[in-house]
Regions:
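Generic detection of long, well-ordered alpha-helical segments
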Residues: 18, 64-65, 175-178
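Active-site-proximal loop and beta-strand segments within enzyme catalytic domains
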Residues: 1-47, 55
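Alpha-helical scaffold elements that line and support the substrate/ligand-binding pocket
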Residues: 45-75, 79, 180-188
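Conserved aromatic-histidine-acidic binding/catalytic patches
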Residues: 37-45, 62, 169-176
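Penicillin-binding protein/beta-lactamase superfamily catalytic region
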Residues: 89-192
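Flexible glycine/proline-enriched surface loops and loop-helix/loop-strand junctions
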Residues: 31-39, 50-51, 161-170
C-alpha cells in the first residue's frame, strides 16, 4: 500500500536523531495506501519498506533504537564487522561512491560469453526477457507520477550525497566492507 510517498523527503529526515523525532513516522501516518487498478495488493516497496520497518522496529525495541543503532550495537561492535545502516560522519571518508555503468558498456558486455569473463549476470537476451516480463506490471504500478523519494534527487548518483549515506534506509542504503559481510556470514554459518 505504500510503494512510494506522494511527497519527497529531506535526506536529513532519515538521520537517527530525526527518525527519533518521528519525522518519517508522521509522513507514513499521513499517507493513504494505494493499490493497482487491477486489484492486486502487492507492489515493490524498495525504499519505503526500509522506512516502514525502521518505524516498526523502533516502536517494539525495548530501548527504542533504530535499526541502524541495533546493527551498530549487536553486529558492528561485537563482531568488529564494518556494517552500517547510516554511516557516521567520522566514517564518511571510508565510503566508496556508487558509480553507474554506462548503457553502452552494459550493452556490449552483455554479449560476452560468461566463460570469457562477462561482468554481468545476464546476457542481452536474458535481460531483454526480464524487461519484457516487467513491462505489463510497470504500466499498472501506483508509483507512476510519484515524486522522487528525496528532495533534490535527480539520478542514482544522489545516493553518494553524504546526507543520504548518513541516513537510515535499511532496505536500500546499508554500507559494508567485504570483510564485514564475511564476519556476519561466518557468525550465521556457526549459528551465532
Amino acid at each position: 500500500g505504500l510503494p512510494a510517498f506522494q511527497t519527497s523527503i529531506e535526506p536529513t529526515d532519515l538521520h537517527t536523531a530525526n527518525i527519533k523525532l518521528n519525522k518519517i513516522g508522521q509522513i507514513i501516518e499521513s499517507h493513504a495506501q494505494t493499490f493497482r487498478p487491477s486489484g492486486r495488493t502487492r507492489e515493490y516497496h524498495a525504499i519505503t519498506r526500509g522506512w516502514i520497518v525502521n518505524e516498526l522496529f523502533r516502536r517494539v525495541d525495548p530501548a527504542g533504537r533504530t535499526i541502524g543503532e541495533f546493527v551498530e550495537a549487536s553486529i558492528y561492535q561485537p563482531l568488529q564487522a564494518d556494517i552500517f545502516v547510516g554511516v557516521k560522519s567520522a566514517d564518511l571518508s571510508r565510503v566508496t561512491p556508487v558509480k553507474m555503468l554506462s548503457g553502452k558498456f552494459q550493452f556490449w558486455e552483455s554479449f560476452k560469453p560468461s566463460f570469457m569473463g562477462r561482468r554481468m549476470e545476464n546476457n542481452f537476451f536474458q535481460t531483454a526477457g526480464k524487461l519484457a516480463r516487467l513491462v505489463p506490471s510497470m504500466r499498472q504500478r501506483t508509483t507512476k507520477g510519484a515524486p522522487s523519494p528525496f528532495v533534490g534527487m535527480q539520478n542514482i548518483d544522489f545516493f553518494n550525497d553524504p546526507a543520504i549515506v548518513q541516513g537510515e534506509t535499511p532496505s536500500a542504503n546499508t554500507n559494508a566492507t567485504a570483510r564485514g559481510l564475511a564476519r556476519v556470514a561466518a557468525a550465521m554459518a556457526m549459528k551465532g
